[in-house]
Design a protein with these regions (language model features):
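Short, surface-exposed basic-aromatic patches at helix termini and helix-loop junctions that form
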Residues: 6-9, 89-94, 167, 221
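Conserved short alpha-helical elements in the N-terminal third of ANL/AMP-binding
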Residues: 1-15, 31-34, 39
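Conserved ATP-binding/catalytic segment of the ANL
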Residues: 140, 145-205
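Conserved adenylate-forming
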Residues: 19-143
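Short, solvent-exposed loop/turn segments at the edges of secondary structure
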Residues: 2, 7-9, 67, 131, ...
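Phosphate/diphosphate-binding loops
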Residues: 215
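Structured core elements
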Residues: 15-16, 42, 73, 102-103, ...
């Protein structure tokens, strides 16, 4: 609903890619991008990572993708800084400037937006600031800060599952989404927040050291 309604609101045209970020399927995405020059391009981080080797060696693909492009958007997972910088390099080499890269954060239960980046940023991982009408609360959870969200976009609960609904909301009515975040700049909250993995997937080693899976996954990839 986010992408469709944004397109309708601005009188645009929406193209649905039949390709996927998987071996044997990313080639369809490459072929599609040679036919269509988007003004806004949406993909998940894995999609960009699989697309990059083609962009780096295929001039026709680069020219088609960047010709009219205003925004590269990603969500659903963390984009690595390496992929961010490689995308910037291809943009600069093709059209002489960096295309604005932005991200958002949310879940199905939040319909789906909670935060958005709406200004130029210089690094991967920033998920922006709360959208109008939405409140975020950062709650200490072990050694991280858990994000909780409240607003008109948040589901009132799970159909016929009062047990799940009760467990999903805190005493202030904030939805406990299970993700973690931190400020991009502790002294300047307006610079946005950074996605910091999940709080529920972390575990402790026998040495007593916490392993933060989200951060580890980003570094390994």
């Amino acid at each position: 609903n986010h992408n469709l309604n944004m397109m309708l609101r601005n009188g645009g045209t929406m193209y649905v890619d039949a390709g996927k970020p998987a071996p044997g399927l990313i080639e369809q995405t490459v072929a599609n991008l040679k036919e269509i020059s988007p003004t806004i391009y949406f993909n998940v981080p894995r999609g960009y990572e699989m697309l990059l080797p083609y962009l780096e060696k295929d001039e026709e693909l680069r020219q088609s993708l960047f010709a009219d492009l205003d925004i590269l958007f990603y969500a659903a997972a963390a984009l690595t800084q390496n992929a961010w910088e490689r995308l910037e390099k291809q943009s600069e080499a093709t059209i002489g400037k960096r295309v604005m890269m932005v991200a958002g954060w949310g879940a199905t239960e939040t319909a789906p937006d909670c935060t958005h980046v709406y200004w130029p940023i210089e690094r991967a991982g920033v998920i922006g600031l709360p959208i109008p009408g939405t409140e975020l609360k950062l709650v200490p959870n072990e050694e991280k800060m858990e994000i909780r969200v409240r607003g008109p976009n948040v589901t009132p609960g799970y159909w016929k599952r009062d047990d799940l609904t009760e467990a999903a909301f805190d005493e202030d009515g904030f939805y406990c989404i299970g993700d973690a975040a931190k400020f991009a700049d502790n002294n300047e909250p307006r610079k946005g927040i950074i996605f910091d993995g999940r709080v529920s997937e972390n575990f402790k080693l026998s040495t007593g050291t916490w392993v933060f899976v989200g951060s580890l996954r980003t570094r390994v990839v």
